[in-house]
Structure formats: structure tokens, C-alpha cells
């Protein structure tokens, strides 16, 4: 397969153009990664609907950005680290806090536990040991939170994999390395 490039507005179908128009309106541009997903309007529309639905879940915007940073670090996705570092800062995280989250070294016990759960799920193909899960419950999370966290991991892993498959240009300021 040839190198995948970021499609222009004219290269995607009408269903994808609807999503392009939406992002242009809310963000001023269509991020390169979402544009690339737009080669398949089905993939783009189903992904954006899935992520938008997660805004109604356990984790508010700031928490979701923290989760996205952890997942992207563990999956080695430079694009998503860049875009979600920018989003995390807009949602109240400092630069230092984003680095701590990514390294699993947040001073907040809740975030240490979330990091361990995410790391276990990613490294063990969905499994997490009893001790890890007991820690998740001990910081106040329930079954609904576990399902929401799993959904966020899956959604972010999708975009992480798209970037790692395509290596499209990163159109956000690069995240600081750990």
C-alpha cells in the first residue's frame, strides 16, 4: 500500500464532509488525524458519535483528557500526545501535570490508580488483576466507571493506531518527551 496522505475536503464523500464542516466550525480546522479517518465516512462518523457519547459518562472533560494522555503515552502515539496535551491544557491541566500523568507519577492517588488500570488493560489485552481492580474500587470507582474507562481506552486506541499506521503530519504543537 502506498503512503497514506491527509485527504482534502474534496477527496472525501459527502457524509465525511459533514464532519469536516462541523470541526471547521467548532475548531477552525479539521485535524489531520480525523481528516485521514475521513477516507471512510463510516469510520469517521461512528468514531465521533462514540466519543461524543462518552461525554455523558463517568469522566468529565478534564478527566477524559488525562485518560487520553495516559493511553496515548502507553500506545506510543505522538500525534495524540500532541493534540491531547493541547486539549488537556485547555481543560485545566498544567504542562507538568500532563507529564506526570503520562509517566504514571501523578501525586494524586486516583490518577496513580487510573494509570495502573489503563496500563494493565493495554499490556494484558483487556485483563486487569484483582489488586489493580481493588485499587480502582478503593478510590471510589464502580462498575459504570470501569465500563466508561474501557470505552475511552478503546476510542483512544483507535486513533493511536490510525496515526501509527499512517504517520500523517502532526498539526499540533509537539508534546514534551518524558
Regions from the language model: what does each represent?
Residues 1-178:
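Hydrophobic alpha-helical segments
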